[in-house]
From Swiss-Prot:
This is Insulin-like growth factor-binding protein 2-A. Induction: Expression increases in response to prolonged fasting but decreases in response to growth hormone (GH). GO terms for cellular component: extracellular region; extracellular space. Residues 177-259 form the Thyroglobulin type-1 domain. The gene is igfbp2a.
């Protein structure tokens, strides 16, 4: 799983976790011939070659229809987008974990409608020129707080009736979040508070963020990477899957550090805290 964060998804996260904003557009820096020449050669045959996620310049194989996709994976092929499961309660978490699926683009906007389209839990792939656009979300109506209050009151009444009739609440409580998931939530909260000026976001604010790469169990993936910056691949390193701390013997490189070779019993034991 590649650990390069898509700027397009970062901005999509802002629209999910922040207030309604107007349409935001920014361009990645252009790729020079020198930077492209420094990219490693592809060792596999690709149905379609695209730029790596984020603002990187190196070529990667695009994901095909039905293949898994997400924040840390190559983008989907032309005509496809990365979607979470339709019934998912946490679509963003699925995309961060790379558990989305590449599917055909679905245009849900009615023809000739002036209403803005609501954002779904999809990864919007940047174009090859580096342009990323995030559709606006519909602002809440004036009576939204009242509706929300009524819904909460209805739920409380229903819960009281269920207790009176000694019926258990069918919804099981959420399991305690892991350290990686807690760190992820903190980063998403920071993203939602980024200030946007003139409908453009300062890329430096996005570059400075590190979104932890969590696996489906909530643990840290062995390989963690920073965003691609100015066409250069982000630095990658290996971490303890339980604590997220760097493995002392692993390197910090712009590429795949092959983290499995640095694993030993100590890193796999959650009770052992590695040295700083």
């Amino acid at each position: 799983m590649l650990s390069y964060v898509s700027c397009g998804l970062l901005l999509a996260l802002v629209t999910f976790h922040g207030t309604a904003r107007s349409e935001m557009v920014f361009r990645c820096p252009s790729c020079t011939a020198e930077r492209q020449a420094a990219c490693p050669m592809l060792t596999e045959t690709c149905g379609e070659i695209v730029r790596e996620p984020g603002c990187g310049c190196c070529p990667v194989c695009a994901r095909q229809e039905g293949e898994q996709c997400g924040v840390y994976t190559p983008r989907c092929s032309s005509g496809l987008r990365c979607y979470p499961k339709p019934d998912s309660e946490l679509p963003l978490e699925l995309l961060v974990q790379g558990l989305g699926r590449c599917g055909r683009k679905v245009d849900t906007e009615p023809t000739g409608s002036a209403e803005p389209r609501e954002v779904s839990g999809e990864v919007q792939d940047p174009l090859d020129i580096g342009l990323t656009e995030v559709p606006p979300i519909r602002k809440p109506t004036k009576d939204s707080p009242w509706k929300e209050s009524a819904v909460l009151q209805h739920r409380q009444q229903l819960k009281s009736k269920m207790k009176y009739h000694k019926v258990e609440d069918p919804k099981a409580p959420h399991a305690k979040q892991s350290q990686c998931q807690q760190e992820l939530d903190q980063v998403l909260e920071r993203i939602s508070k980024i200030t946007f000026k003139d409908n453009r976001t300062p890329l430096e604010d996005l570059y400075s963020l590190h979104i932890p790469n969590c696996d489906k169990r909530g643990q840290y993936n062995l390989k963690q990477c920073k965003m691609s910056v100015n066409g250069y691949r982000g630095e990658c390193w290996c971490v303890n899957p339980h604590t997220g701390r760097p493995m002392p013997t692993s390197p910090l490189i712009r590429g795949d550090p092959n983290c499995n070779q640095y694993l030993d019993g100590q890193e796999m034991d959650p009770s052992v805290d590695p040295p700083n």
